[in-house]
Amino acid sequence: MGIMELARIDLSRDDLDKRIGGGIPHGSLIIIEGEESTGKSVLCQRLAYGFLQNRYSVTYVSTQLTTLEFIKQMNSLNYSINKKLLSGALLYIPVYPLIADNKKKDGFLKKVMETRAFYEKDVIIFDSISALIANDASEVNVDDLMAFFKRITALKKIIICTVNPKELPESVLTIIRTSATMLIRTELFTFGGDLKNLAKILKYNMAPGSYQKNIVFRVEPKIGIAVEIASVA
């Protein structure tokens, strides 16, 4: 093993890359776990934009937003991705309409695994994988899904999945957490009267260097994620 290859996510406006050890190792399977509105999606959006700005290609599968809503959301954070969508560097796949009608679908995850175009990019993001698993009517074996993700990351690709723990049984969560090379938990907390987001790095198997275990951030219009110095015990 030579020096670990890192995918760069640096942006001049924040120092998130330094907080996580300088970049994201190729071959990472990152799980961002947290309840509703704790900052999982915005963290994915920041990472996606960071990868794109550093010339990596990204597939973004969303159970949350239509394409237009995603473009608006990214623009509101000043993470403009219009050109990246047009050039094909960013492939955005909204599966929201499929989930919105509340009917469980057969073979939902099978389709996710069989759509080759998703995995042609350098980075593949599923926001959220828990919604995809919870909305699949067929007997999906999450072990199989994680084994499949491992085969993809073995090709030096990076997969990032968000998980709302309320959507899945503990047995499934355990499989997902165990499979992750990096596990981040997002939380909300109050600090000096302000609501802040906290990203706790609980596991980082391939950490390239020293990293900050507790990253405090807030979401600001036109700035995106603003990482704070504030430390949390």
Swiss-Prot record:
Keyword Heme: no
Keywords annotated in UniProt: Archaeal flagellum, ATP-binding, Magnesium, Metal-binding, Nucleotide-binding
Pfam families from the UniProt entry: ATPase
Primary location recorded for the protein, binned into one broad class: other
Keyword ATP-binding: yes
Example GO molecular function: ATP binding
Superkingdom of origin organism: Archaea
Binding site for ATP: 38, 40-42, 64, 196
Localisation: Archaeal flagellum
This protein's name: Archaeal flagellar ATP-binding protein FlaH
Gene: flaH
